[in-house]
Amino acid sequence: SINLYDFGCMRIFKSKFIQGVIDLYFALQKNDEALAVHAYEQWGFDDITKEKLDILSKWANFLYAPLMKDKVQKIQESDSGIYGAQIASEVHKELKKIGGVKPPKEFVFMDRAAVGLGSVFMHLRAEVNWYKVFHELIENFDQKKLTEKQQSTLKLVNL
């Protein structure tokens, strides 16, 4: 197992946000724009126009790409982060053209974690069936149960 710590910080993602991660996965898989808009709204984005949706989905398609195929593969075909940096640059430029976007705080933390973990898996040259792993992780996800568990755990530690 690999444990990553963000300089001693602990991130708590609300169940609604986690549900948005799952919903966006299925939205991208099924090319379901309404579900994608709903997912982004669960993350805290607002005013999702068709143009903004298309731009945000470029980045999402990059991040979710390894989860889309049921096969053993690297997290990214290239062993460098150049492709990801190019996608990020394109998305940034396109968002700037339409007036920008204020990313929700949780999105920034999740994005950092995804990029960081992706980098670790690239350097390890890990070949995994990411689709299978993701489906095993989300198989029994229950937003209500997670909310209850988070609330009781945070209360237990006075947070």
Regions found by a protein language model. Give the residues of each.
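Helix-rich C-lobe and terminal helical cap/extension of kinase-like folds
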Residues: S1-L159
